Regions:
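Conserved glycine-rich cofactor-binding loop
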Residues: 15-16
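Substrate-binding pocket helix/loop in short-chain dehydrogenase/reductase
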Residues: 95-96, 100-108, 204
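Alpha-helical segment proximal to the catalytic Tyr-Lys
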Residues: 124-125, 166-170
Length: 247
């Protein structure tokens, strides 16, 4: 029997990077997996990479209407869940003098509001003994210039992990957070011009005690540990950052 045989999983933000790597490991282990994303191209590439066993659904993690529809779809596909991995998120770097209300709202809508309502709408589907894993960020513990709104939104999400863990204990659902440091995903190149992205990569390597970027697979292994192995752990945050937040 495969390690995750019979497990039913939804990954919010699962069409690239850390979410996609987690989906691959779960599918390889025999799980049934539904992943979401916004980009048509990303959805198509994810379906191709994950294969026909994966359910790939267009859904905007900021939209409560989309989340309602996704919960209905999940109920129809799986009936119940063993893991909800809330991974959708994005950073807009904005120094203090350039922050606008639109940037503030975008960062909190995607990185805090969306995850909170995702858990609210999916909690009734999660089996006793099931798990929620939220993706926070090293930006919620490290003061980084230009990250005021993103870091604050991720800090709010970290707080949600604690509170939701307390609220869902009666249902025997654990809630934890995985906290990535610099991870080698396309997000840097999407957020910055090529030259700036290269400079950021080099600068971050210098800050990380282990002197390298992490991989999506390293995040995926941490997520699966929290989801299925850490059965006496809830409300916790697991840094996967090469020691940056600790040393």
């Amino acid at each position: 029997m495969k390690r995750y045989e019979g497990k039913k999983v939804v990954i919010i933000g699962g069409t690239s990077g850390m979410g996609l790597a987690t989906a691959k490991m779960l599918l390889d282990g025999g799980a049934r997996v539904l992943v979401t994303g916004r980009s048509k191209e990303g959805l198509e590439l994810a379906q191709k990479e994950l294969g026909s066993d994966a359910i790939v659904v267009p859904s905007d993690a900021r939209s409560l209407t989309d989340l309602d529809a996704l919960a209905v779809r999940t109920k129809a596909e799986f009936d119940t869940l063993d893991l909800l991995f809330v991974n959708a998120g994005f950073s807009i770097r904005a120094p203090l003098e350039t922050i606008t209300e639109a940037i503030y709202d975008e960062m909190f809508n995607l990185n805090a509001k969306g995850p909170l309502f995702t858990v609210q709408k999916f909690a009734p589907l999660i089996n006793r003994g099931g798990s929620v894993v939220l993706t926070t960020s090293i930006a919620n513990v490290k003061g980084m210039a230009g990250n005021a709104t993103y870091g604050a939104a991720k800090a709010a999400l970290r707080s949600f992990a604690r509170t939701l863990a307390a609220e869902l204990i009666p249902s025997e659902i654990r809630v934890n957070a995985v906290t990535p440091g610099p991870i080698d995903t396309p997000i840097v190149e999407k957020a910055f011009p090529a030259e700036a992205a290269a400079q950021i990569r080099e600068k971050m390597i210098g800050m990380v005690p282990m002197k390298r970027w992490g991989t999506s697979e390293e995040i995926a292994r941490a997520v699966l540990f929290l989801a299925f192995d850490a059965t006496f752990t809830t409300g916790a945050e697991l840094p996967v950052d090469g020691g940056w937040s600790q040393l």
